[in-house]
Amino acid sequence: MSKVNEIIEIVKGLTVLELAELVKAMEEEFGVSAAAPVAAVAAVPAAAAPVVEEEEQTEFDVILKNVGNEKIKVIKVVREITGLGLKEAKELVDGAPNPVKEKVNKEEAETIKKKLEEVGAGIEIK
C-alpha cells in the first residue's frame, strides 16, 4: 500500500474533533490556512470617490468557552445541536474552549447560545 493510501485510511478512522486538531496542526506546521480564499475585489474606476462600506457579518461561529457546573446537561445540549455521538460531544465539552457550530446565521447562533446558557455554559459568538 502506498504512503498516500495509508494516510487516507488513518484519516478515515479519525473523529471530527481529531480531524479538526489535525487541520490545526498542519496549518501551524506548514504556515498555511485551510480557509477558502477570498475572491479579489474589482477595481473601482478612478473617477469615482472611494466608498467605504462595511459588510454585515452573515456567518457566525458559536464557541463553547466554559462548561459551568452542569457538564452532563451541556453534553446533552451539544449532542442535540451538533448531532455528535456521546463520546465526540464529551470530548468537545471537555476540550473547551471549542467551536460548537461554525458558519451559522445570526438567528441560529443566538438560539444555540440561549440553549447552552440555559444549562450554565459560557458561550461566545464570533
UniProtKB/Swiss-Prot annotation:
Pfam families: Ribosomal_L12 (PF00542), Ribosomal_L12_N (PF16320). GO terms for biological process: translation. GO terms for molecular function: mRNA binding; structural constituent of ribosome. Transmembrane segments: none annotated. Keywords: Ribonucleoprotein, Ribosomal protein. NCBIfam families: L12. Belongs to the bacterial ribosomal protein bL12 family. Forms part of the ribosomal stalk which helps the ribosome interact with GTP-bound translation factors. Is thus essential for accurate translation. This is Large ribosomal subunit protein bL12. It comes from Desulforudis audaxviator (strain MP104C). The lineage of its organism: Bacteria, Bacillati, Bacillota, Clostridia, Thermoanaerobacterales. The gene is rplL.
